[in-house]
Design a protein with these regions (language model features):
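Glycine-rich FAD pyrophosphate-binding loop
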Residues: 50-73
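Glycine-rich Rossmann-fold phosphate-binding loop(s) that bind the pyrophosphate
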Residues: 37-43, 63
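Helical element adjacent to the flavin cofactor pocket in flavoenzyme catalytic cores
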Residues: 148-153, 176-234
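Dinucleotide-binding Rossmann-like beta1-alpha1 core, especially the glycine-rich loop
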Residues: 81-166
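Extreme N-terminal leader/targeting segments of oxidoreductases
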Residues: 1-33, 51-57, 456
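Active-site-proximal substrate-binding core of FAD-dependent oxidoreductases
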Residues: 356, 368, 396-431
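Short beta-strand to alpha-helix junction loop
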Residues: 101-109, 133-142, 182-202, 211, ...
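Active-site substrate-recognition segment that forms the wall
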Residues: 76, 118-126, 218, 230-270, ...
Length: 459
């Protein structure tokens, strides 16, 4: 059956080159490193491996095409942070190591831009930062506490993260009900599909092999079983993110959650003069049910949000990506935020699956004794962290000393998710509670105790 890959996102539809799949695996083979997953994590790992040791035989195994998953569908936020936040790293290691991880994440945003330039990847990279609005009193208080805490505990300055008053925030994004906001400098907007497709081409040029249309069935020490043959490898890298649950024995490793997006038609200069985002800042507000957007290189708004239900037993179902009522709700949120967009044409509606570990803490690891390596669990914030993860994995695998190989997420192993039906009840219950918390905060102006309690339970 022919798959219409361009229908999977604005970014894939707009990709200027062909999306024809590379050849699948042609039978049993033997390599030095087998990387399972042709998204950011897998390709960054392969890219850095081949730069560190060009003699390595590196094989990337991808079920569909490079960028089919979240790497070709996300919001294009290359942001220097983890979903878990630095407090988690501070608790589990030390303040000093948490600061080092933050610094490495900030640098990874610039590293993505450097590699895009070096490899001539035209992905519309624009480091304009993030504007996160406060649109009720609870959001404003939460932001004020966050900025003060991060500057005090982790040494951030106004050059990294700063509060904006209402006028300053509206000058960046002319939204409704703005009380203030936070500006975070370490973010770039980009076209995610052009980045991941360009990475695939870079891996090809470096001598790596990418086998597409090849489904990995199981992974174990020294071996990957696929539907096109068995791969023997000294090192096996799991880089499957939201699709990890499809591997034998990994149904409870990461839970796949959906995020859905829409894109407007290209907007005229008069509309942009009213909206703002002059530096292509990415944007959001501080609600618990996350929204996120960017001004694309061709003048659209690409805008998304959470809220799609979790499928029982980690079910991945393409029909969830086209739930029209969820897309309609996302459009309502966009117009409520920016009323001047009422009536603009929506040209694309899509969605994708992201990977969530039980403790919301991404990890990178390599067991030299077994040759098993892994990275992921970014909870939807993987564009920049995947670069750091792939770079770190390559250094661990090749035995290269660097300041990255002992960062606090290296070697972390999240506990397994609960079995069904507990998992289904807990995740979908949490989604409902967070939506309720947002409504309560909007009405009362006070931070929701429901949300505070739920965050503690989830993490």
């Amino acid at each position: 059956m022919t798959v219409d890959y361009r229908s999977r996102s604005l970014w894939l539809d707009d990709f200027p080159g062909p999306l024809d799949p590379r050849s699948p695996l042609s039978g049993d083979t033997q390599v030095d490193v087998a990387v399972v997953g042709g998204g950011y994590t897998g390709l960054w790992t392969a890219y850095y491996l081949l730069n560190l040791d060009p003699t390595l035989r590196v094989l990337v195994i991808e079920k569909e095409i490079v960028g089919f998953g979240a790497s070709g569908r996300n919001g294009g936020w290359c942001v220097g942070e983890l979903a878990a936040g630095p407090d988690r790293q501070q608790r589990e290691s030390s303040n000093e190591t948490a600061r080092r991880l933050l610094g490495a994440l900030h640098d990874s945003v610039d590293e993505v831009g450097r590699i895009a330039d070096r490899e001539s990847i035209d992905c519309g990279y624009a480091k304009g930062g993030t504007i996160r609005l406060a649109r009720n009193s609870a959001q404003l208080e939460r932001q004020q506490a966050e900025v003060a805490h991060h500057q005090r505990e982790f040494g951030l300055t106004d050059a990294d993260l700063r509060m904006l008053d209402a006028a300053e925030a509206r000058e960046q994004l002319n939204a409704t009900d703005v009380l203030g906001g936070v500006f975070f400098a370490h973010t770039a907007a980009l076209d995610p599909a052009r980045l991941v497709r360009g990475l695939g081409e870079a891996v090809d040029r470096l001598g790596g092999t990418i086998a597409e249309q090849t489904a990995a069935i199981s992974i174990e020490s020294g071996r990957v079983a696929t539907d096109h043959g068995t791969v023997q490898a000294d090192v096996v890298v799991r880089a499957t993110e939201g699709y990890t649950s499809t591997l034998d024995g990994h149904s409870r490793t990461l839970s796949p959650l959906y995020s859905l997006m829409i894109a407007t038609e290209p907007l005229g200069d008069d509309v942009w003069a009213e909206v703002g985002l002059a530096n292509r800042q990415t944007f959001a507000d501080d609600r618990h049910m996350v929204i996120y957007g960017q001004r694309t290189a061709d003048g659209r708004i690409a805008f998304g949000g959470r809220g799609a239900p979790y499928g029982f037993a980690s079910r991945i179902d393409a029909s969830i990506e086209q739930r029209s009522h969820i897309h309609d709700r996302i459009l309502e949120s966009l117009v409520e935020l920016l009323p001047m967009l009422k009536g603009v044409a929506i040209t694309h509606r899509w969605g994708g699956v992201l990977g969530v570990p039980r403790d919301w803490y991404p990890s990178v690891g390599f067991d030299r004794a077994t040759g098993m390596a892994w990275a992921g669990g970014y909870v939807g914030e993987g564009v920049s962290p995947a670069n750091l993860a792939g770079r770190t994995l390559a250094e661990l695998i090749t035995g290269t000393d660097s300041p990255r190989i002992d960062l606090p997420w290296v070697g972390h192993e999240s506990r397994k998710w609960e079995p069904e039906p507990i998992r289904w009840l807990a995740i979908n219950g949490a989604l409902r509670i967070m939506g309720l918390a947002d409504r309560l905060e909007q009405r009362s102006g006070r931070e929701s105790l429901l949300a505070k309690g739920m965050w503690k339970l989830m993490r």
